[in-house]
Amino acid sequence: MSTVDILSPAGEKTGSVELPAEIFGVEKISIPLIHQVVVAQNAAARQGTHKTKRRGEVRGGGKKPYRQKGTGRARQGSTRAPQFAGGGVVHGPQPRDYSQRTPKKMKAAALRHALTDRARHNRIHVVTGVIEGENPSTKAARTLFGKISERKNLLLVVDRADEAAWLSARNLPQIHILEPGQLNTYDVLVSDDVVFTQAAFESFVSGPNKAVDTEGSEA
């Protein structure tokens, strides 16, 4: 079980906390599992409202454009056939549901594997708070994040009730804010570092993500 330092809003070490092995210490990270869950998550985010009109849905074209024989041209029955300009679209996209069925255990396991990868590369951080006091300060939040990591994309996990942290960090570019219950595999992977407030960290590790992988190793 590894440990990480707990930093104050000023960036100073105030203590340390252990990263539970069942969440941050998976023995073997499964890339196919992570890939499957991320693909499913991105697919579920698609609206699927794309729509083209078939020849039967396009307005007009009810009259035969010219007689069947004697013109020397190919026979045509409607000017709304796919080969005509203004005609219907053949095999075009239609509204559909792109979502895939992904078991909850699979989602939770993929998240643990992603967090393990970040923990192995020392990219999990815990802070007592984003700012000192209750007055929001974007400047103070920017200074803290600069001390935590030189990398740009940070995922900040804060408690729902920590309004000062939300207001301080929400306008910072490349800072994505989530609650502990919203933490997911995709957002962990697209972020360089994951920063927990201490309250959010305690809430997350005591939640439903504390489980055992089906392969037999703890995750």
From Swiss-Prot:
GO-annotated cellular components: ribonucleoprotein complex; ribosome
Coiled-coil stretches noted in the UniProt entry, renumbered to this chain: none
Pfam families with a match to the protein in the record: Ribosomal_L4
InterPro entries in the record: Ribosomal_uL4, Ribosomal_uL4-like, Ribosomal_uL4_dom_sf
GO BP terms, alphabetized: translation
GO molecular-function terms, A-Z: rRNA binding; structural constituent of ribosome
Biased composition (Basic residues): 61-72
Disordered, as annotated region: 43-101
Signal peptide residue numbers: none
Annotated keywords: Ribonucleoprotein, Ribosomal protein, RNA-binding, rRNA-binding
Chain's role: One of the primary rRNA binding proteins, this protein initially binds near the 5'-end of the 23S rRNA. It is important during the early stages of 50S assembly. It makes multiple contacts with different domains of the 23S rRNA in the assembled 50S subunit and ribosome. Forms part of the polypeptide exit tunnel.
Similarity annotation: Belongs to the universal ribosomal protein uL4 family.
NCBIfam families for the chain: rplD_bact (TIGR03953)
Protein name per UniProt: Large ribosomal subunit protein uL4
Organism per entry: Streptomyces coelicolor (strain ATCC BAA-471 / A3(2) / M145)
Lineage of producing organism: Bacteria, Bacillati, Actinomycetota, Actinomycetes, Kitasatosporales
Gene: rplD
